Regions:
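Residue patterns forming the tRNA-binding/recognition surfaces of aminoacyl-tRNA synthetases
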Residues: 5, 19, 26-27, 97-216, ...
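Conserved phosphate/anionic-ligand binding catalytic regions in large, soluble enzymes, centered on
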Residues: 59, 84, 217-235, 350-352, ...
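Feature 926 captures the class I aminoacyl-tRNA synthetase adenylation module centered on the KMSKS loop
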Residues: 205, 398-458, 462, 506-549, ...
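Non-catalytic terminal extensions that flank enzyme cores
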Residues: 1-56, 79, 351, 583
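N-terminal catalytic cores of NTP/NDP-binding nucleotidyl/phosphoryl-transfer enzymes
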Residues: 35-96, 159, 220-221, 226, ...
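Extended active-site and interfacial segments that coordinate phosphate-rich ligands
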Residues: 59-67, 217-253, 276-283, 293-300, ...
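Auxiliary tRNA-acceptor-end handling modules of aminoacyl-tRNA synthetases
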Residues: 1-9, 80, 222, 367, ...
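Short, solvent-exposed turn/loop segments enriched in Gly/Ser/Thr/Pro and often Arg
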Residues: 36-38, 46-47, 80-93, 147-155, ...
Length: 887
């Protein structure tokens, strides 16, 4: 039996958190080698950007993972949690480009690719560990010896293998398609790198003359500057107004190009005029329509966002803004602009440089997704991978069923350079797992590698198996793969979860993870998404410094339900810091009463009091509930259960009852039994709390009698059936109801705290009478009672008393000598009058249709809640007044 007997001072989160993280890591508790005799449990950490700083989303994500890992470690599983960071292509490149411009006044082109990449690697080495230190600060017990980086040698080898294998199967190809293009960063962007903002714009109504007729089709467009790239006008085949135009030719304004009116179901009959211009090179939906109808695609913009010669000599070289102004002016002069309407619409911006993103048809590398999506869909359909909550399966299925080919090339320098070489002599295109020095076809030395790099998500898609050393058959891969669970937000199901599924199903022939545990976003107290623009972001490290990482973790988990967003309140962090302090003080009290503790002493069941039997039974029940909650991803419920047990059952009830026996030096066996129960239940509660609040629980556990070296590897509490006393626990609960009834009656009657009240109890049966007689001291200890009278049901009931009925008993509180009845009657009457006034005011307000029809729904609901509360209060005051009349 071990036991740190050093005196426990006041609770200081900062001191203990640094101490215990270093201890765990130094002792190697985060690391486990593959052990075939134990069931594996593995998680790969979603890699934060190497440029990143910890935000509340990271804090939630890592807290949930750490809770699961600590629970499974204590439950005896062979556990591994692999951390790592993502090279974050464009994000990192932009950071270094900004630094280069600021410090040297140069661009990356000025210093060249090789030198620029040296600078990026140097920046990564200098700042890349910052996010790791922040993850540590939260208490994340991941195995840092297995740390991976998406561009380290192991991951780079996996990336090459996957690219070349897909290329050889014809699943990677080069072609022209619409991509999100940033004219400033000069690269294609993934959808997640585009921020959509509502902007005030216009809808221009333009006439397209019908060839050979004195007629025209009116189209509505938000982008008149792209008219010169139009190669068709489309209408819905079901639109009766437009059927007569299908197959006819119209003239595209300004460039006088003859184009056909085509029919396509995509066209929304209700939008604009029901006719739309089709510009395949500059709109993703138009591109798809162009593919269906074999339309010409005309690029009228340069990659820097200016107009080119194909737009017409007049517009060549103009910026988009200049071109729009000129086009609108020319349309007006020609009498082809009918009218303009104001319109708010979403406009995409590059998330890094904030430039407006242009949909452009550019030559890129793509992954052919439909063949790969089939097995990823089937695996979830078979139940090989389950989404928690299950409703997210539909979102996953819908995306994969409607998937488009994936653009994987980026016009950046930082990232995995595409492993494709072009021969300058014979034109051969070669994909290779190793760097080429000559053309495999003609052996020419005149070859060059594709300058583009892969989308960051390409390497991230391989994360579940590349982190374990694939393509080598490593011990980690053989034992820990597939991983047990992926913990992630619902916002990246498309970008990451689905891609990991298809990549792993293709290359590992099994799923990457058995479960996908989805959480929501952390929003501010008003329900808004945290963002730089709103200035409402909260730094988790600042919160940890103020209240402790344990309090932050507990706030994040108790406010969280699977798949749902949560609101973050600083008041809750403070309350959970108070909870940690409560546990600290309770532990301090127990430790102070262990001077004569005998670790060899084991009481018999006869030694246990009613309170002992109740708390031991309650602890068993809590072990069941918390274990079940953690096993079914109801982490918030599990945390709330152990919180309620520790604060209420143990601290507020059991410790108070145990004090009588601890202070009785004449009954050694009773004192020893109380010590035994206190230590057993407190160390057990600390173990249950450990996954949620690892630091404070480790510290307190070390100061209590225990077996083993550290709580992080201590056995998870189990139910001891021999210490289940269901009937006694039920009886104790009745006693507690009676105590609470007395407390409530005292509070309602405004009995001063210093005055003890005589109580009369009338049990419903002999068995209950015996319990009340045996444990009447509980009422004196917990309910501030000086006298307890126990009557038979046939005895006369006391007069001048208020009464409450609890299970199997009636409770009478004699108030006459405790309060000034006249004064209390006047106070209650005044409160009744005030309450009636509030009820009248709210009833009048809610009967006003001007208010109920115009006010926001939430405001009306709030007023209804207030009215219900005041009506409830009025009933309580009426009862109180009746009680006073009988005193």
């Amino acid at each position: 039996m071990k036991w740190d007997k050093e005196k426990l001072e006041g609770y200081n989160p900062g001191e203990i958190e640094a101490k215990w993280y270093d201890f765990w890591e130094k002792e190697g508790y985060f690391h486990q080698d593959p052990d075939l005799s134990r069931e594996p449990y593995s998680i790969v950490m979603p890699p934060p950007n190497v440029t990143g700083q910890l935000h509340m989303g990271h804090a939630l994500d890592n807290t949930l993972q750490d809770i699961l890992i600590r629970f499974k470690r204590m439950s005896g599983y062979n556990v591994v949690w692999i951390p790592g960071t993502d090279h974050a292509g464009i994000a990192t490149q932009v950071k270094v480009e900004e630094q280069l411009a600021k410090e040297e006044g140069k661009t990356r082109y000025d210093i060249g690719r090789e030198e620029f990449l040296k600078r990026v690697w140097a920046w990564k080495e200098k700042y890349g560990n910052r996010i790791e230190q922040q993850v540590r600060r939260l208490g994340s017990s991941c195995d840092w010896s297995r740390k991976r980086f998406t561009m380290d040698d192991i991951c780079a080898r996996a990336v090459r293998e996957v690219f070349v294998a897909l290329y050889e199967k014809g699943l990677i190809y080069q072609g022209h398609r619409i991509t999100n293009w940033c004219p400033h960063c000069h690269t294609a962007l993934s959808d997640i790198e585009v921020d959509h903002k509502d902007e005030a714009g216009h809808l221009w109504y333009v006439k397209y003359p019908v060839i050979g007729e004195d007629d025209y089709i009116m189209i509505a467009t938000t982008r008149p500057e792209t008219i010169m790239g139009d190669t068709a006008v489309a209408v819905n085949p079901e639109d009766e107004r437009m059927k007569k135009y299908i197959g006819k030719k119209v003239l595209v304004p300004l460039v006088n190009r003859e184009v056909e009116v085509i029919a396509d179901d995509y066209v929304d009959i209700e939008f604009g005029t029901g006719a739309v211009k089709i510009t395949p090179a500059h709109d993703p939906n138009d591109f798809e329509m162009g593919e269906r109808h074999n339309l010409e695609s005309i690029m009228i913009m340069n990659l820097d966002g200016t107009m080119n010669a194909a737009a017409g000599k007049e517009f060549d070289g103009m910026t988009l803004k200049e071109c729009r102004k000129a086009v609108v002016s020319d349309l007006e002069k020609l009498g082809l602009l009918d009218h303009v309407e104001e319109l708010n619409h979403a406009v995409g911006h590059c998330s890094r440089c904030k430039t407006t993103v242009e949909p452009l048809s550019t030559k890129q590398w793509f992954v052919r997704m439909k063949p790969l999506a089939e097995e990823a869909l089937a695996a979830v359909d078979r139940g090989d991978t389950k989404f928690i909550p299950g409703r997210f399966t539909k979102i996953y299925d819908h995306w994969l069923e409607n998937i488009q080919d994936w653009c994987i090339s980026r016009q950046l320098w930082w990232g995995h350079q595409i492993p494709v070489w072009y021969c300058d002599d014979c034109g051969e295109v070669s994909a290779s797992r190793t760097d080429l020095t000559e053309c495999p076809h003609c052996h020419s030395k005149h070859i060059h590698q594709d300058p583009d790099v892969l989308d960051t998500w390409f390497s991230s898609a391989l994360w579940p198996f590349s982190t374990m050393g694939w393509p080598d058959k490593t011990p980690d891969l053989q034992h820990f793969f597939p991983t047990s669970v992926l913990v992630t937000g619902y916002d990246i199901i498309f970008f990451w979860v689905a891609r990991m599924m298809f990549a792993t199903c293709e290359f590992m022939k099994e799923v990457p993870f058995k479960d996908v545990f989805i959480h929501g976003l952390v929003r501010d107290s008003q329900g808004r998404k945290m963002s730089k623009s709103l200035g409402n972001g909260i730094d988790p490290l600042e919160v940890s410094d103020m209240y402790g990482a344990d309090a932050l973790r507990f706030t994040l988990v108790t406010g969280n339900t699977p798949g749902n967003d949560m609101r973050f309140y600083m008041e809750r962090v403070e309350a959970n810091r108070n909870f940690a302090n409560k546990i600290w003080n309770a532990s301090k009290f127990v430790i102070m009463n262990l001077e004569d503790y005998d670790p060899e002493f084991v009481p018999t069941t006869d030694d246990f009091t009613l309170a002992d039997r109740w708390i031991l039974t309650s602890f068993n029940q809590v072990v069941r509930q918390v274990t079940k909650g953690l096993g079914s991803y109801e982490l918030g419920d599990a945390a709330a259960t152990v919180y309620d047990f520790t604060w209420n059952s143990f601290c507020d009830w059991y410790i108070e009852l145990a004090k009588q026996r601890l202070y009785k030096s004449d009954d050694k066996r009773s004192r020893q039994t109380a010590q035994y129960v206190l230590v057993r239940v407190l160390t057990g509660a600390l173990a249950l709390l450990h996954p949620f609040m690892p630091f404070v629980t480790e510290h307190l556990w070390q100061h209590l009698p225990h077996e083993g070296e550290s709580l992080i590897v201590a056995p998870w509490p189990t139910v001891d059936e021999a210490l289940d006393f269901a009937e006694d626990a039920a009886t104790m609960n009745i006693m507690m109801e009676a105590v609470k009834a007395i407390r409530n009656m005292r509070a309602e009657a405004n009995v001063p705290m210093g005055k003890k009240a005589p109580v009369t109890l009338v049990p419903a049966d002999e068995a209950m009478a015996e319990v009340l007689h045996t444990y009447e001291t509980y009422f004196k200890t917990l309910a501030f009672v000086d006298e307890v009278h126990i009557l038979k049901t046939t005895d006369a009931k006391p007069e001048n008393a208020v009464v409450t009925v609890v299970p199997r008993s009636e409770v009478y509180l004699l108030l006459k000598d405790l309060i000034d009845v006249e004064k209390e009657t006047a106070r209650v009457a005044k409160e009744q009058e005030k309450t009636r006034g509030e009820i009248e005011r709210l009833e009048k307000k809610l009967s006003n249709k001007g208010f109920t029809d115009k006010a926001p729904e939430a405001v009306v609901a709030k007023e209804k809640e207030k009215l219900a509360a005041y009506r409830e209060k009025a009933e309580a005051l009426n009862k109180r007044m009746e009680d006073l009349k009988h005193l």
